[in-house]
Amino acid sequence: MPQIKSAIKRVKTQEAARVRNIAQMNAMRTAVKKFKTATEQNADNSQDLYKAAARAIDMANSKGLIKKNKAGRDKSRLSALLNK
């Protein structure tokens, strides 16, 4: 456990950021899973779910949770599923 005041503050800040990052990643994964299940079942709202998933991927990328290449690769794969 840190003894220095600034280190104690850093631990609190890091914990808050960790919780926020986990929530953002979970939201992204959920959006992608919803889109994939919708495309497998040939649902009508797959276009809307694609937009939501792409937006979630972009948000995770902009927050530094995933790298730029992974974001592009994931979006490309989702669009290929959509156009199939």
From Swiss-Prot:
InterPro entries: Ribosomal_bS20, Ribosomal_bS20_sf. One of its GO terms (cellular component) is small ribosomal subunit. GO terms for biological process: translation. One of its GO terms (molecular function) is small ribosomal subunit rRNA binding. Keywords: Ribonucleoprotein, Ribosomal protein, RNA-binding, rRNA-binding. The keyword Hydrolase does not apply. Binds directly to 16S ribosomal RNA. Belongs to the bacterial ribosomal protein bS20 family. HAMAP family: Ribosomal_bS20. This is Small ribosomal subunit protein bS20. It comes from Lacticaseibacillus paracasei (strain ATCC 334 / BCRC 17002 / CCUG 31169 / CIP 107868 / KCTC 3260 / NRRL B-441) (Lactobacillus paracasei).
